[in-house]
């Protein structure tokens, strides 16, 4: 359709998957940090 070879398509899909995984990992890290901060505040209260 757009002249993309199967290898190019696979590489593009792999890059998109890697970006999605990084985004999910960043979100999980932020959530964990927030939960830890809340737990620390609750423990000190």
From Swiss-Prot:
Assigned keywords, A-Z: Antifreeze protein, Repeat
Keyword Repeat: yes
Modified residues (Blocked amino end (Met)): 1
Transmembrane segment boundaries: none
Record bears the keyword Repeat: yes
Cited function: Antifreeze proteins lower the blood freezing point.
Family recorded in the similarity comment: Belongs to the type-I AFP family.
Protein name, as recorded: Ice-structuring protein SS-8
Organism: Myoxocephalus scorpius (Shorthorn sculpin)
């Amino acid at each position: 359709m757009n002249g993309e070879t199967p290898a190019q398509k696979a590489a593009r899909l792999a890059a998109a998957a890697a970006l999605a995984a990084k985004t999910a990992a960043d979100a999980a890290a932020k959530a964990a940090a927030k939960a830890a901060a809340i737990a620390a505040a609750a423990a000190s209260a």
